[in-house]
Amino acid sequence: MRPIIEFCLSNLASGSHDAMEELEKDPNLDIIEYGCLNHCGTCALDHFALVNGEYIAGDTPEELVSNIYKYLEENPMF
């Protein structure tokens, strides 16, 4: 089972698209786009994704990618 990374379309339009494109290169991740993930207050402030249901954010797309991999390293699925 691979980690699931969920992105909000509104947040992608705000700059997280670069993070999603980088993560899509990793065959060990499942990337899913949704219209809304119901994090509207923080969506307007940060780049974010849900990683296995956990909210992960970053000030930049690069920081978001780094924080996602850090979370996955600290919280292995097996």
From Swiss-Prot:
Signal peptide feature range: none
Domain of life (superkingdom) = Bacteria
Q: By its UniProt entry, which InterPro entries does this protein fall under?
A: DUF1450, UPF0349
**Pfam families listed in its UniProt record:** DUF1450
Q: Family, per the entry?
A: Belongs to the UPF0349 family.
Instruction: Quote the protein name from its UniProt record.
Output: UPF0349 protein ABC2936
| Source organism (scientific name) | Shouchella clausii (strain KSM-K16) (Alkalihalobacillus clausii)
